[in-house]
UniProtKB/Swiss-Prot annotation:
The active site is at residue 140. InterPro entries: DapB_N, GlycerAld/Erythrose_P_DH, GlycerAld_3-P_DH_AS, GlycerAld_3-P_DH_cat, GlycerAld_3-P_DH_NAD(P)-bd, Glyceraldehyde-3-P_DH_2_arc, NAD(P)-bd_dom_sf. The gene is gap. Homotetramer. It comes from Pyrobaculum calidifontis (strain DSM 21063 / JCM 11548 / VA1). SUPFAM superfamilies: Glyceraldehyde-3-phosphate dehydrogenase-like, C-terminal domain (SSF55347), NAD(P)-binding Rossmann-fold domains (SSF51735). This is Glyceraldehyde-3-phosphate dehydrogenase. The lineage of its organism: Archaea, Thermoproteota, Thermoprotei, Thermoproteales, Thermoproteaceae. It catalyses: D-glyceraldehyde 3-phosphate + phosphate + NADP(+) = (2R)-3-phospho-glyceroyl phosphate + NADPH + H(+); D-glyceraldehyde 3-phosphate + phosphate + NAD(+) = (2R)-3-phospho-glyceroyl phosphate + NADH + H(+). Pfam families: DapB_N, Gp_dh_C.
Length: 344
């Protein structure tokens, strides 16, 4: 049984903790919170031991939250630590808590790539991460792009170049201090956005350029992709590649999928926790092939898409399961769409 500690119990961390708790080969030994807020109380109510920094223990006690120990205590009790701290805090934690303890550590895409030995996406480079001490799961947008490109590559469809245009959600649903509210903001104005170079930390030989804007929504990101293939292909070939690849969902307008909000509503109706949609949501009707040119649009649920990747990264770090066994095990445990998917 792999003992997993989760440092940071916010948007991503709480989802990772819940996902780890569903694995039959892992258990959550504790989570780190720095503020004694409602999320800390929920963590305790879910049965996760709560840890914090040594100088914050008294604040938690005053708030009526039992503290199991310090950050150092949790790291010592863990086989693998998943750091889901806010951007750049993971690097600080590495220097402050992690370097001196010989464990395995998983960081998130908000950290720069050099925080880890390898940037990770399960479909693309699971084996490259096996046995690594420091692994970085790439960001939500990078995960979405990498999955789409990997679906093609894994099915023998080569890529000459990819040009991806991203409409980023302005904030997560709970982020009341972020925006925009009534604007469309180049994010950044310069080309490329950071997503293309980030994809290349995983798929190192892909010719990719990305551009992004932030828009006043909270539900999901939308990607509009132009991909030049290695030669003429049929639309059916591309659709079959997406249909067979895990963690990709093909949505039909005829079935009622006409917007990103409908994916979230679908997830709620399915009874998925928090209305999460970890799959890349590809609009089947948008998939267009003209000779060697592929066009498509797809949605990326920023709050949950990286969660299955983190579970697989834990196994990769310890080298306990082969790639496809881990991916299938994770997908089934999280009740992702597995019918018709190829795990080999």
């Amino acid at each position: 049984m792999i003992k997993v500690g989760v440092v940071g119990y916010g948007t991503i961390g709480k989802r990772i903790a819940d996902a780890v708790a569903l694995q039959d080969d892992m258990r959550v030994v504790g989570v780190v919170k720095m503020t004694p807020d409602y999320e800390a109380k929920i963590a305790a109510a879910r049965g996760f031991p709560v840890y914090t920094a040594a100088d914050r223990v008294e604040k938690f006690k005053k708030a009526g939250i039992e503290v199991a120990g310090t950050v150092e205590d949790l790291v010592k009790a863990s086989d693998v630590v998943v750091d889901a701290s806010p951007e750049d805090v993971g690097r600080e934690n590495k220097e402050k808590y992690y370097r001196q303890l010989d464990k395995r550590y998983i960081f998130q895409g908000g950290e720069e790539a050099d925080v880890a030995e390898v940037s990770f996406n399960a479909l693309a480079n699971y084996d490259e991460a096996r046995g690594k001490r420091y692994i970085r799961v790439v960001s939500c947008n990078t995960t979405g792009i990498t999955r789409v490109l990997s679906a093609l590559l894994l099915n023998g469809i080569g890529i000459r170049k990819a040009r991806i245009f991203i409409a980023r959600r302005g904030a997560d649903p709970k982020e009341h201090k972020k925006g925009p509210i009534n604007d469309v903001v180049p994010n950044p104005t310069a080309v490329p956005s950071h997503h293309g170079p980030d994809v290349q930390t995983v798929l190192k030989d892909v010719d990719i350029v990305t551009m992004a804007v932030a828009v006043p929504v909270t539900i999901m990101h939308m990607h509009m992709a132009y991909i030049e293939l290695d030669g003429p292909r049929s639309r059916d070939e591309v659709l079959e590649a997406f249909a067979k690849t895990p963690r990709i969902f093909l949505a039909d307008v005829g079935s009622g999928f006409q917007s990103l909000a409908q994916f979230i509503e679908y997830a709620r109706d399915l009874g998925r926790p928090r209305g999460d949609f970890p799959e890349v949501a590809v609009f089947r009707d948008s998939v267009t092939v003209r000779g060697d040119e592929l066009y498509l649009m797809y949605g990326v649920h920023q709050e949950s898409i990286v969660v299955p990747e983190n579970v697989d990264a834990i196994r990769a770090a310890l080298g306990v399961l082969p790639k496809w066994q881990s991916i299938e095990k994770t997908d089934k445990s999280l009740k992702l769409f597995t019918e018709g998917k190829r795990y080999a």
